[in-house]
Every structure is written in structure tokens, then in C-alpha cells.
């Protein structure tokens, strides 16, 4: 309660002060009289006047009272130019900083909650360009002094930066007003102090840093390209390296705009998602789910039975699913769309030239106005001692290695409890493997809230999976033809024997062999890009897993639009990649879907929120389907229906999430979802009931009391 009370008190002080000033307005003639009296008093109280003046100026600016202009003039009249200039410069900056800190203390929580996830992106912009913005605003004296103080206080700008930039930015304006104050007795009005030409001059001076920045960037760009000869004509408008989720969309968009585009792929069209990731994993998840339903058919009033799992036939179905989808991403389809598809290894020779070592033999060099790197990612294998000896599997290799096995691996270790490891662990357990899931973190699916991890882990354990969290793998080996892995937990080492091990601890971008190092393009965990997905060279862009920060197929396609449009039309208009609403799902049983903030993320970032939770065990359709487990959890701005984040755990969570993704993207609140008809009986009603739970928690009790009395009166 302290903050609201303090805020109300400060507002009352400011309002009363303003009302008093309006009742006794200050004009130039009154100021001149006050100054003449103070000049006489100054003769015997010089230092006291300096201290009182400085304190008064600080209070006026800290409380945002409309007296700063008059006090600046008075400084020139009382103390002369240099002493007045120094006094005003420091006092105004100190007062402004106090107002800045007060706004941060009193209002920042409210603003964080109101802006939600956008607050983080605003602060990123302030961290990068905040000093430039502030300097520009300070240089233009007609912009409200108090407004700048309050607005900047709501950002993450450091107080020290604010003080220094404010003081430097206000020097010119301070000098003008203090100098005018030295001639206060001769002034007839304030209009001559800040004339239109002077305001324009200040504005131009304020814009100078931005102009200088543009010039510097232009010079840097010219320097970057200086070692290369730009072609006078180009063979292509765009060359895309990689035909995965991002590369295919890039090529599709470019062809749709009638650009001449070449798509280069070194391995399989469709990339990891089609051939090793999303599609094959979902195919095996479905087979595993059917096997589980057969074992538990009594849930549906049927006789349970143990399914006969011929693992090679399951893998044959996986291959067939991939083959059925492959035409969507095929060379023929994209050729028919107008894309030139070349199969081979691409290497960027210079900013406008790509050399392709063709699988069919020979090499081909093409010049291009723009290049998009969309080379994807590959499984990361930790450098454990002995890991190569045991013959580990990854999400890339397991499909081919295990395709002819009649049975699933009897003893399977899955290293990593993230989305990939979790999905594969449950699938293989349901298909007959004895699975041990090893996770170094304190819980599986660490990106989600703890209650999500707990619910999924309980499901895993019901499927017979041994879940070992907080266990660190330290070495692997083979003893008497038996493979093993050592893990450490609470300083104790344990040995686990296995027949096969799947490594699923993450994925690393493919960065080597494309000529990036030779061009000086920075690569770390990903290719370094700016907000427009441009690399060091503005005509070379990156999209998808290789660019980060997300590793989802749908995000790769999302980035592809920005990368392609910026590559083709960046000279006219560029677009910053928009990551404000990024959904994802983990297809375990139960499924987990999320968009926006989790509770843990909201707490870590200091964003105020309310939680509304609806248990799916209450949902009619879920009960009818014998799938009455899970929940819908919605985070909203306190007291408002604006959605900050949603987590859904339960059957078809990934599908149910789409309604909230749409709502967040287009600024629709829970009231809109509540007011939308949902078909009965469907799982989608869970979203509406969650919105209803929020509405019930925000019913106006006084209004209900009035309505109850109205009904009582109507009954007579």
C-alpha cells in the first residue's frame, strides 16, 4: 500500500501547487520585481541564496512544477551567466533524476504489467539507442521537460546515464535562458528568447547524432565491402542456402514476387523437420499412443490387450509418412513454382557470389544481389569420455539405424529431458523399451513451470520410464560387450547399463563450410544478425535455426518472411523480425502447449500478473474421452483481461493453443474469448471456461448486491 499512498500524496502536492500558481500567475513583470528584491538581499546573504536557490530548483524539477523556465531566467539575473549556468545545469539534472527515480519507483510495476512482454523489447531498444533518444529530446527546448523525466524513468535506463546525458543535452538550452536572464530587466516578453529559427537550430542539433550515426553506418558499410568488387549485373536476385523449413519459405516467397531465385540443398529437401525431426517423431508418437490405448482399453470399456509390436513395421510406417509428405517439399514442386533448385554444397565466395559444388559433378558460380543462410541445426553431442565407443544415436540417425529392428531396444537410455528427449522417451517406452531418462537439471522440460514438469513426469513414470533428474552424465564405456554410462547425483556415481542410447541434449546450428569465417561474419551459438536478420553484410541474411533465438519449424518460416522481404526490398523498406507471440508445443502425453510468459518467466522479469486456472478434469468432452487430466493456465495483466501468457497441458494442447495465439497477436482479451461461441462438446471449450473463470474472479460484488436488491424488488 505504500506506493499508491505515496503516489497519491505527490499528485496532490503537484496539483495543489499548479492550482496555486494559476491563482497567482507569474508573469515577467512580477519576476522582475522579485529579482530586484533578491539582488538587494543577496548583498549580505550570497551563499545562503545560492543554497536556497539550488534546493528550490531541485524541488521544482523533481515535482515537475511549471516553474523551471522562470527559475532559469532568475538564475541569470541573480548570479550572472557562468555561476547561474552552473547552478541551473546541476540543479536541473539532479531534479530531473529525482523525478526519473520517483517515476520508476511508483509506476514501473504498473507499466510492466500493462506492457507485458513488450516491455522487454522496449528496454532492449532503450539499452541500444536510449542515450541517443534522450539527447535528442533534451536538445529541443519546447518538448515538456517533466514528461521526458517521467517517461525515461519507466524504462531500464541507468540513472547515471540519464543524469549525464540530460546534463549534456540541456547545456545549450540552459545557456540561452540563463543568458536571457542576465538581461531580465530589459525583457518585454519570453517570445524573443526562443524564436522559431532558434528552435529549428536546436532541433537540427538534436538530430545531428542520428545523422552522424547514419553517416558512420554508411562509411562502415562501404569499408566492409571495400575489399570486394561488386558486380555490375547479377545472375540472381536471391540465393538461398538450405532447403529446410526456413529456406523453403524464403524461396517460395521470392518466387511469388517474381524474383529470380536459386535454392541450394546439400542433402534432403525438407531439411531436418521432414526427414528426422517433426514428422517422423510425430508418426512414431501416434503408433506409440495406439499401443498404449490397446494396453489400457479398459478405460474405454473394452478388453485390454498387449499389442504385438513389430518394430520394423512401425519404422516402415514412419518412412511412409515421410514419403507421403515429401512431395510438398520436393524439387519438382519448387521448380514448378519458379525456383531453380540445385543439389550440392554452397560456399559464399564474396558478398555477391556463391559457388556450388554440384552433386552431379562440377561447380557453378552465381552472382546474386542477396543471400539467405538457412542451413539449420544438428544434434549437439556432449564430449563425454567414451561416448564414441558406445555408438550413440541422435534424432538424425536413429531412424535409419533402427529401421530393420524387429523389436525396440530392450534397454534404452535417453540423455536429455527437453522436448525431443521427452517425446522419444515416452514413445519408445510405449513400444516396449525399458527407458531411463537422464536429465542434468532439477526437472524435465525445464523451460516450463514446475507443475507442468511434475505432471508430465508422473505420466512418464506411469508408462514405466525411470526418470533421473539432477543426474549428470560423466562418462560412457563398454565392458564385456555391455554398454554403460556413469552418472553423478549428490556426489555419488551410478552405472547404468543399456543397449542403445539416444542423445537429445540440444541442437547446434550448422555454421561450418559455408564461407562465413572467411568473410568475417561473426558466428557464436548462431550466426550473428541484427533485428532485420542481416549479418555483417546487409545483403547476406540468416533465418531459421542457424539464426536463432528459437528452434521451431514455425518460427523458421516466420523469420523467412522477414529475411526474404528485407533481402529483396531492404533498400526501400526493412522490417524487424517480430517475436512477440511465439507459440510452441511438446507432443508428450499429455501434450504441453505454451505461448507468451510462464509464471517463472514473469517472476524473473518482474512483470506483475494474475493467474487464472481451469482444470480439464472438469471438461465434459475430456471426461467422455477418458482424457480428463491437465489444465489451462492464463496469465493476465492484474485487473485486466489482456493475456500475457498461456500454458495448456492436456489432450490436443497444441491445437487448443491456437485460439490464444490469435488473441494475443491481435490484442483480444479473455472477454472476447468468453463472448465467442464454442461447439459443445469439444476440448476447445476449455479455453472459454478458463475465460469464464477469469470473469467470475472479477465480478463487481457491489453491482451484484444492487442487482440482487433489484430482483427482490421485482418479486414484490
Predicted regions located by residue number:
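Membrane-interfacial helix-loop-helix
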Residues: 2-7, 16-56, 89, 93-149, ...
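Glycine-rich active-site loop/strand segments that organize a redox cofactor
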Residues: 281-319, 576-577
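Glycine-rich dinucleotide-binding loop and its adjacent helix/turn
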Residues: 278, 375-434, 438, 517-536
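Flexible, glycine-rich terminal cap/loop adjacent to redox cofactors
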Residues: 241-243, 255-267, 279, 283-287, ...
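A Rossmann-like FAD-binding core segment of flavoenzymes
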Residues: 304-305, 323, 340-343, 347-361, ...
Amino acid at each position: 500500500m505504500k506506493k499508491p499512498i505515496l503516489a497519491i500524496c505527490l499528485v496532490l502536492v503537484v496539483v495543489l501547487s499548479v492550482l496555486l500558481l494559476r491563482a497567482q500567475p507569474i508573469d515577467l513583470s512580477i519576476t522582475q520585481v522579485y529579482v530586484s528584491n533578491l539582488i538587494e538581499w543577496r548583498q549580505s546573504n550570497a551563499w545562503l541564496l545560492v543554497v536556497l536557490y539550488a534546493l528550490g530548483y531541485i524541488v521544482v524539477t523533481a515535482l515537475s512544477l511549471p516553474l523551471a523556465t522562470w527559475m532559469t531566467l532568475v538564475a541569470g539575473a541573480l548570479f550572472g551567466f557562468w555561476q547561474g549556468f552552473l547552478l541551473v545545469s546541476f540543479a536541473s539534472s539532479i531534479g530531473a533524476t529525482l523525478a526519473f527515480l520517483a517515476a520508476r519507483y511508483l509506476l514501473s510495476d504498473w507499466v510492466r504489467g500493462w506492457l507485458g512482454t513488450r516491455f522487454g523489447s522496449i528496454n532492449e531498444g532503450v539499452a541500444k539507442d536510449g542515450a541517443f533518444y534522450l539527447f535528442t529530446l533534451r536538445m529541443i527546448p519546447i518538448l515538456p521537460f517533466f514528461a521526458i523525466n517521467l517517461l525515461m524513468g519507466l524504462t531500464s535506463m541507468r540513472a547515471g546515464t540519464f543524469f549525464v546525458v540530460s546534463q549534456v543535452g540541456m547545456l545549450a538550452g540552459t545557456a540561452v535562458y540563463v543568458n536571457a536572464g542576465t538581461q531580465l530587466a530589459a525583457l518585454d516578453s519570453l517570445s524573443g528568447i526562443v524564436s522559431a529559427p532558434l528552435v529549428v537550430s536546436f532541433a537540427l542539433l538534436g538530430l545531428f547524432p542520428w545523422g552522424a550515426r547514419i553517416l558512420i553506418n554508411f562509411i562502415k558499410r562501404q569499408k566492409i565491402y571495400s575489399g570486394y568488387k561488386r558486380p555490375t549485373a547479377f545472375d540472381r536476385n536471391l540465393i538461398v542456402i538450405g532447403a529446410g523449413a526456413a529456406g523453403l519459405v524464403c524461396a517460395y516467397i521470392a518466387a511469388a514476387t517474381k524474383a529470380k531465385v536459386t535454392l541450394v540443398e546439400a542433402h534432403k529437401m525438407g531439411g531436418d523437420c521432414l526427414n528426422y525431426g517433426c514428422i517422423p517423431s510425430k508418426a512414431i508418437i501416434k503408433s506409440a499412443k495406439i499401443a498404449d490405448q490397446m494396453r489400457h482399453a479398459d478405460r474405454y470399456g473394452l478388453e485390454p490387450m498387449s499389442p504385438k509390436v513389430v518394430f520394423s513395421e512401425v519404422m516402415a510406417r514412419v518412412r511412409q509418412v515421410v514419403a507421403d509428405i515429401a512431395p510438398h517439399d520436393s524439387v519438382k514442386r519448387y521448380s514448378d513454382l519458379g525456383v531453380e533448385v540445385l543439389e550440392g554444397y554452397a560456399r559464399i565466395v564474396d558478398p555477391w557470389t556463391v559457388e556450388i559444388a554440384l552433386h552431379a559433378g562440377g561447380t557453378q558460380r552465381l552472382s546474386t544481389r542477396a543471400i539467405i543462410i538457412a542451413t539449420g541445426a544438428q544434434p549437439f553431442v556432449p564430449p563425454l569420455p567414451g561416448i564414441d565407443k558406445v555408438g550413440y544415436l541422435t534424432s538424425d540417425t536413429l531412424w535409419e539405424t533402427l529401421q530393420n529392428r524387429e523389436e525396440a531396444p530392450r534397454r534404452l537410455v535417453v540423455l536429455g529431458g527437453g522436448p525431443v528427449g521427452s517425446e522419444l522417451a515416452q514413445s519408445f517406452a510405449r513400444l516396449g523399451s525399458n527407458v531411463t531418462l537422464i536429465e542434468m537439471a532439477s526437472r524435465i522440460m525445464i523451460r516450463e513451470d514446475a507443475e507442468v514438469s511434475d505432471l508430465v513426469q508422473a505420466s512418464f513414470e506411469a508408462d514405466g520410464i525411470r526418470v533421473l533428474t539432477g543426474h549428470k552424465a560423466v562418462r560412457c564405456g563398454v565392458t564385456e560387450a555391455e554398454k554403460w554410462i556413469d552418472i553423478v547425483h549428490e556426489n555419488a556415481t551410478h552405472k547404468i547399463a543399456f543397449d542403445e542410447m539416444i542423445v537429445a541434449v540440444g541442437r547446434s546450428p550448422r555454421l561450418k563450410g559455408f564461407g562465413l569465417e572467411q568473410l568475417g561474419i561473426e558466428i557464436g551459438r548462431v550466426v550473428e544478425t541484427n533485428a532485420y536478420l542481416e549479418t555483417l553484410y546487409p545483403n547476406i541474411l540468416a533465418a531459421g535455426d542457424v539464426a536463432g533465438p528459437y528452434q521451431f519449424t514455425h518460427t523458421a518460416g516466420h523469420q523467412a518472411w522477414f529475411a526474404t522481404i528485407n533481402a529483396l526490398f531492404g533498400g526501400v523498406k526493412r522490417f524487424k523480425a517480430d517475436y512477440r507471440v511465439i507459440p510452441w508445443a511438446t507432443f508428450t502425453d499429455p501434450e504441453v502447449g505454451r505461448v507468451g510468459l510462464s509464471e517463472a518467466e514473469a517472476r524473473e522479469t518482474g512483470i506483475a500478473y494474475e493467474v487464472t486456472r481451469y482444470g480439464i478434469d472438469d471438461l465434459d468432452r475430456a471426461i467422455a474421452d477418458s482424457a480428463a487430466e491437465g489444465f489451462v493456465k492464463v496469465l493476465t495483466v492484474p485487473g485486466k483481461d489482456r493475456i500475457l501468457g498461456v500454458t495448456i497441458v492436456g489432450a490436443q494442447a497444441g491445437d487448443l493453443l491456437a485460439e490464444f495465439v490469435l488473441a494475443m497477436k491481435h490484442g483480444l482479451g479473455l472477454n472476447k474469448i468468453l463472448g465467442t461461441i464454442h461447439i459443445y462438446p469439444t476440448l476447445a471449450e476449455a479455453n472459454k471456461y478458463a475465460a469464464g473463470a477469469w470473469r467470475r474472479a472479477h465480478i463487481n460484488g457491489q453491482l451484484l448486491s444492487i442487482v440482487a436488491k433489484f430482483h427482490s424488488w421485482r418479486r414484490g
